[in-house]
Amino acid sequence: MKIREKLPDFPVVRADRTTTKTRIVFDASAKFRGKSFNSEALSGLKVQADMFSILVRFRKELVALVGDLSQMYHQLFVTLEDRPLHRFLWRNLDQSKEPEVYEFLRYVFGGCYSLFCAQYVWQKHADDHKAEYSLAAEVVKNSCYMDDLMPSVETVEATKEMRQQLTEIGHKAGFHIRKWIAQTPEAVRATKVDLERREFPVTKILGVVWIV
């Protein structure tokens, strides 16, 4: 018998986001008769570095660089036999219509396995191409948390090379890196001048406020 599952969904609204302010999350942890999709699925191993080590490396060198893997989970296809487990109801916000049944073709935000699978693909490509992209391979292994990249290097020139390598290795893995932010010495000096006027960019790195 083929198992079928309909995943409930809910919106997560983040008004502070510069790109996608509303994200649809599929609740794979919702229980039916005491079980949920996530409780039965294999979540995979932890393959990314721990948060504390990443933050320490991020603060280590003079120039910091931040990037974001755009829609990381949606770059991975769900296998044909697993698609009935990724069903959901949708009526395009029209409450007069009966919901229709769809199947997700890509990995969903909310599945316990999504992070491991995405990180495995990302790290596998980095390892396969580490001879050609040594800087990027090191970043993917030690300075990547979920879909965020946050390395630091000694010089602006090294930052440019690292960004280029990460972009190229991302293309090989099917990932697009966006929202690049770099903290150069020039930016640091400008920040000190503008402290009183509050005219400096502010972002968050793993929940920690970072004044660029």
Predicted regions located by residue number:
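Conserved acidic
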Residues: 1-212
